[in-house]
Swiss-Prot record:
Protein name, entry field: UPF0178 protein CKL_3490
Similarity annotation: Belongs to the UPF0178 family.
Pfam families hit by this protein: DUF188
PANTHER family xrefs: UPF0178 PROTEIN YAII
């Protein structure tokens, strides 16, 4: 098991690294050339910048049993198809039961934006988000994939 992080947009990296360190799990953070990241624990892999370049590298590198941390529903859907686990940086676990709803909401939001409409901005990160990430990531690690998180 490894933890692969979409580092272009992942608050909470320090929480993930601390849990991984405690459990002796390799962490790989992927980012593009527009984001310079450093870590004392994780391996940082920088890829060329481009539309979804980090996402595609993660999908190509993920293995069965890995955990992927990403805000992108499309990435989550693809890694679930590869028998890996996916969790949002706010600690929500992606699973087969919520992917259709999330992907449909993403589709509707993109349609609204294309027609000039506005969608809501993401909410600011809270201490509850940190707690949820810590608890649910730990559950994924301990149990492989026993879903005990909150649904969306």
């Amino acid at each position: 098991m490894r933890i692969l992080i979409d580092g272009d947009a992942c608050p909470g990296k320090y929480i993930i690294e601390n849990i991984a360190r405690e459990n002796d799990i390799e962490v790989i953070i992927y980012c593009d050339t527009n984001h310079i990241l450093k870590s004392n624990y994780s391996t940082v892999v920088t890829v060329d910048s481009g539309f979804q370049s980090v996402d595609m590298v993660i999908v190509n590198k993920v293995r069965s049993g890995d955990i992927v941390v990403s805000q992108d529903y499309g990435v989550a859907a693809m890694v679930l198809g590869k028998k890996a686990y996916a969790i949002n940086p706010k600690g929500y676990i992606y699973h087969e039961g919520n992917m259709d709803k999330l992907l449909f909401e993403r589709y509707i939001s993109s349609k609204v934006r294309r027609t000039g409409g506005r969608t809501s901005n993401p909410k600011k990160r809270t201490k509850e988000d940190d707690k949820r990430l810590r608890e649910n990531l730990f559950q994924l690690i301990l149990n492989g994939k026993v879903y005990k998180g909150e649904d969306w």
